[in-house]
């Protein structure tokens, strides 16, 4: 029977010593195989022994933490004592450090819990509309790679190839770094470079904050050209530059060179250019002349026509810069909140309502319209982050108590869709009393619709992630929403139901183990034959039509509990 003769380490060493010039296949491989150490499992005599109960010597305070509570301290973690060759000393030290931190420092547990809670929410900082990045100098120690990139781009401005110069000028405008050597290189190429490079260099200088008379004159010359695309790029760059310029306080602003010549050119473009170019020109003029009646009238006309994104640009100028809070502006903000397809624009609309304030809304007679639309957005908005922003706006406008009363009363609506809407709204408005919390638990037991049960479950999880009282109440609860088998056995209440044998049937076993997508979608339920509600509500909201009652008996004890809740609220 053929077999492979095992390699002996002494034979290989002897042959290498006697004949070092010889080479043969797999020589290094065989040597490595022969030199590899053999790891054997620990014998029964080498395995660590456990003593029950542990000796008193193990119970002592940690040397570095004399004020901590004593615990049973071992030299090595138990989980790492089975094999010596699986973990090196560095990993063992890290494991010991982690175990000590978990035992001693209660703040570690708190940090882990807070990190887990953040999984439920999309941080508002991710949606806050940031002002356009201002140009700034860069220190070499801050970002060495970006500093090296700046050096390479400034050298490319001196390249004999025109396309390299053009690309370098565009890239420097995107980086928004206004160091002296960058500005000097751009000014030099703007005077001596080809025509296309000069055009891009002047545009980049304006974006970087250089608005002297030479740059403004070059931009005016470009705005008078017949090339529509080039004119649009110039207007966009000028608008970005003036936006950064207006963000600085008035006492620290630099004077815009040849402003008197730039204003008439912008006024002419507003009257004679295309809609998009006219809007950009109006925005540029709005930064220079915030009280211009011409700009205000043009932007108000833009609110009734054009794309939603263009309307949002006009709204930003009217609300934030020109401080126009008239009825058409408020209606346009509500329209953006209700029907805009851009997530950031809907979020920014909620911030605009805060800026306008309840007094201006009441003065324009739009309080009822605003209340009805905000109430609708607390449940039909697909993204949780925007629903949370709507709830914050409701609280800022002091409309939350009235809305909470209506939403809590809607929990007992016989229609399943109405109940689900109320449950989703409570997920962002919050649970303000123990009676409402227990009512939601009773609804979870009595509800037959799986969609409503799922919404109830998500609402309880969201409220538990921000309310310590609810979190403590649900600590040992199992929220199980799964398809019940079709049997004649009556199902037990959810709060006392045992866990199913198959854990895969559970949607969420424990709210502490749940990992909801921060932008989970609340699917709107529409019935067959039911008309779709318009995106923007009319001035006077119509009363809700009577919907058919849900099939199946309703729990009278929940109605009684709601009546008690209403009496307490009064």
From Swiss-Prot:
The organism's place on the tree of life at top rank: Eukaryota
Gene3D superfamilies for the chain: Leucine-rich Repeat Variant
InterPro entries in the cross-refs: ARM-like, ARM-type_fold, HEATR9
PANTHER family, A to Z: PROTEIN HEATR9 (PTHR38323:SF1)
Protein name, as recorded: Protein HEATR9
Species whose genome carries this gene: Macaca fascicularis (Crab-eating macaque)
């Amino acid at each position: 029977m053929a077999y492979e003769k095992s390699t002996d380490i002494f034979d290989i060493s002897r042959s290498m010593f006697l004949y070092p010039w010889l080479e043969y296949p797999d020589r290094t491989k065989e040597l490595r195989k022969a030199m590899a150490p053999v790891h054997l499992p620990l014998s029964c005599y080498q395995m660590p022994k456990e003593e029950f109960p542990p000796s008193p010597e193990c119970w002592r305070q940690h040397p570095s933490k004399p004020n901590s509570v004593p615990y049973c301290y071992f030299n090595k973690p138990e989980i790492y004592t089975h094999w010596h060759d699986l973990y090196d000393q560095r990993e063992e030290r890290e494991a010991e450090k982690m175990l000590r931190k978990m035992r001693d420092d209660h703040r570690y547990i708190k940090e882990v819990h807070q990190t887990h809670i953040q999984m439920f929410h999309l941080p508002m900082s991710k949606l806050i509309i940031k002002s356009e990045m201002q140009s700034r100098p860069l220190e070499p120690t801050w970002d060495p790679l970006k500093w090296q990139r700046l050096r390479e781009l400034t050298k490319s401005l001196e390249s004999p190839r025109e396309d390299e110069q053009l690309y370098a000028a565009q890239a420097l405008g995107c980086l928004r770094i206004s160091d002296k050597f960058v500005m000097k290189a751009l000014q030099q190429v703007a005077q001596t470079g080809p025509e296309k490079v000069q055009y891009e260099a002047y545009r980049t200088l304006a974006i970087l904050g250089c608005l002297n008379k030479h740059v403004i004159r070059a931009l005016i010359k470009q705005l008078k050209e017949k090339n529509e695309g080039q004119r649009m790029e110039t207007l966009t760059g000028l608008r970005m530059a003036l936006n950064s310029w207006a963000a600085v306080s008035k006492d620290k602003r630099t004077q815009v060179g040849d402003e008197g010549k730039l204003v008439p050119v912008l006024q002419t473009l507003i009257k004679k250019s295309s809609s998009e170019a006219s809007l950009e020109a109006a925005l540029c003029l709005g930064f220079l002349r915030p009280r211009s009646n011409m700009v205000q009238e043009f932007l108000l006309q833009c609110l009734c026509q054009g794309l939603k994104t263009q309307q949002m640009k006009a709204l930003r100028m009217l609300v934030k810069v020109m401080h126009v809070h008239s009825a058409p502006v408020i209606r346009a903000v509500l329209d953006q909140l209700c029907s805009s397809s851009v997530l950031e624009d809907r979020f920014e609309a909620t911030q605009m309502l805060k800026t306008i304030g309840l007094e201006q809304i009441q003065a324009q007679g739009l309080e009822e319209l605003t209340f009805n639309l905000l109430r609708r957005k607390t449940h039909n908005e697909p993204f949780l982050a925007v629903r949370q922003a709507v709830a914050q706006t409701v609280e800022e406008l002091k409309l939350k108590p009235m809305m909470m009363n209506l939403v809590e009363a809607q929990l007992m609506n016989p229609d399943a869709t109405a109940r689900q809407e109320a449950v989703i709204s409570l997920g962002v408005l919050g649970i303000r009393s123990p009676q409402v919390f227990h009512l939601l638990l009773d609804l979870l037991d009595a509800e037959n619709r799986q969609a409503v049960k799922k919404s109830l479950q998500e609402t309880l999880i969201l409220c538990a992630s921000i309310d310590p009282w609810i979190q403590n109440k649900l600590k040992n609860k199992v929220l199980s929403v799964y398809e019940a088998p079709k049997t004649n056995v009556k199902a037990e209440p959810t709060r006392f139901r045992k866990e199913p044998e198959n854990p895969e049937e559970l949607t969420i076993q424990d709210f502490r183990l749940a990992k909801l997508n921060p932008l989970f979608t609340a699917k709107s339920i529409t019935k067959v034959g039911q008309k779709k509600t318009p995106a923007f509500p009319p001035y006077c909201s119509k009363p809700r039509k009577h919907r058919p009652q849900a099939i199946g008996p309703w729990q009278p004890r929940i109605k009684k509990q709601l009546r008690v809740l209403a009496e307490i609220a009064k």
